[in-house]
Structures are given as structure tokens and as C-alpha cells.
A protein has these predicted regions:
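A local structural motif
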Residues: 10-30, 40-43, 169-173
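Predominant activation on well-ordered alpha-helical scaffold segments within soluble catalytic domains
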Residues: 6, 54, 157-160
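Secondary-structure end/capping motifs
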Residues: 90-170
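Conserved C-terminal helix/tail region of periplasmic/extracytoplasmic solute-binding proteins
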Residues: 161-204
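Short polybasic/polar patches that bind polyanions
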Residues: 10, 58, 164-165
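Pocket-lining segment of extracytoplasmic ligand-binding domains
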Residues: 20-23, 33-125
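Short linear loop/turn motifs
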Residues: 22-25, 136-146, 174-186
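Secondary-structure junction motif
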Residues: 1-5
Length: 204
């Protein structure tokens, strides 16, 4: 979120610094805190993932100025990756493969019944957090998400490059080898689904 916001501001002629300088003050904070501060009029805007973006619109009267999906090729960019340590992967490949099989099966179940899956996720959020999303927030947020086994590797590299450009890192981090999609592609092939690419950032 921080990188995406600063990058967009820079592209439109605004300046920010990681120490709070520039002509736009960017204050990194939790999504929940952002909602509270926006309701109180203490912040003017926010760059948020779902369901927080929908909550700001529906619960606090915010207006969408930029939909990040419009900034990426085909509207696709990564927000969440499933990760394990290299040590764990090497020591327990069968467990990792079983985890991936579950993730791919869940992806297929969501595609087969998106509305039922949406409602199940809403119930799980309530059970895990004790907080219930309103039906309107849940429906709107879900409509803006795409669940996929594709890591969309090119978007991770682009974000890393942007982080350096806006001063969050001194230089673009070396992401070589960050992906090992070998087991994932085995699971996808066994499921009759297309394999996915590491975008030159690791094994496939």
C-alpha cells in the first residue's frame, strides 16, 4: 500500500519522504486505525486493500479516486502470496505439496460457487475475529478480489522496483530465486489446470 501510494503520487507530480516530508504527508498505519482516523476527519485519504476500502466507502462516506487495478496490465497484481521458508520446503516437501493441493482445491471451489464461498469467508471472519462485516461490505469487497494460484510475479518485481524509486529502499531488492513453483505446477498439472510462471524470479 505504502509503495503503491507513493509511486502514484510521484507519477502525478507530488513529493513524499519516508520521514514525513514532501508536499503530501504519508503516515503508514494499520488499516483499522485508518478507518477510525478517517471517520474522525484526522486523515484526508487512504490507499487500502479490501475489505477496508469498501468499509471506508460504505461506513465513512469515502469516494474512490484511484482503483489500483486500473494501474496494472489486465488489472492483475499480487496482494497475497502463500510462503514457506526454504528450509521447511527442503525438509518437508510432501507437507508443502499437500498445502498447495488444498489451496488449489479451495481456488476451484471458489470458482464453482463464488457466492457461497463469499458467505463462508464472511462467517469465518466473524468466527476468527469476533467482528462481522456487513453484507454490503462483504459483497462489494468480494467483487473486487480475484483468487488465483498465479503469483503474478511481474507485479512483485514492479513493486520492488517502485519501492526503490520512491525511497523506501536504497536500491531494488534482488528477488532472484524468491519463487519455487515446482510443486505448485505439479499440483496444477495434476488438476488439469495451466501452469504458472515465476517470471524469471525462480523455479517453475
Amino acid at each position: 500500500q505504502d509503495v503503491a501510494l507513493r509511486s502514484w503520487l510521484s507519477a502525478h507530480g507530488y513529493t513524499t519522504t519516508v520521514t514525513g516530508g514532501g508536499n503530501v504527508l504519508v503516515a503508514p498505519q494499520s488499516n483499522a486505525q485508518t478507518l477510525s482516523l478517517f471517520k474522525a476527519g484526522a486523515v484526508d485519504g487512504a490507499w487500502l486493500p479490501e475489505p477496508w476500502a469498501s468499509r471506508l466507502r460504505l461506513e465513512a462516506g469515502a469516494t474512490t479516486l484511484v482503483d489500483e487495478a486500473t494501474l496494472w496490465p489486465q488489472g492483475r497484481f499480487v496482494t497475497t502470496n502463500l510462503v514457506v521458508s526454504t528450509t521447511y520446503l527442503q525438509a518437508h516437501p510432501e507437507q508443502v505439496k499437500a498445502l498447495l493441493q488444498g489451496a488449489v482445491a479451495a481456488d476451484a471451489a471458489i470458482a464453482a460457487d463464488p457466492e457461497g464461498s463469499r458467505d463462508s469467508v464472511g462467517s469465518a471472519i466473524t468466527a476468527l475475529t469476533g467482528a462481522k462485516l456487513s453484507t454490503q461490505v462483504l459483497h462489494e469487497a468480494w467483487s473486487r478480489l480475484t483468487i488465483t494460484p498465479d503469483p503474478i510475479a511481474s507485479s512483485l518485481q514492479a513493486s520492488a522496483t517502485a519501492a526503490a524509486a520512491v525511497g523506501i529502499t536504497k536500491s531494488p531488492p534482488d528477488l532472484s530465486g524468491i519463487y519455487d513453483l515446482t510443486l505448485l505446477n505439479q499440483v496444477l498439472t495434476a488438476s488439469g489446470r495451466p501452469t504458472v510462471s515465476a517470471g524469471g524470479l525462480g523455479k517453475e
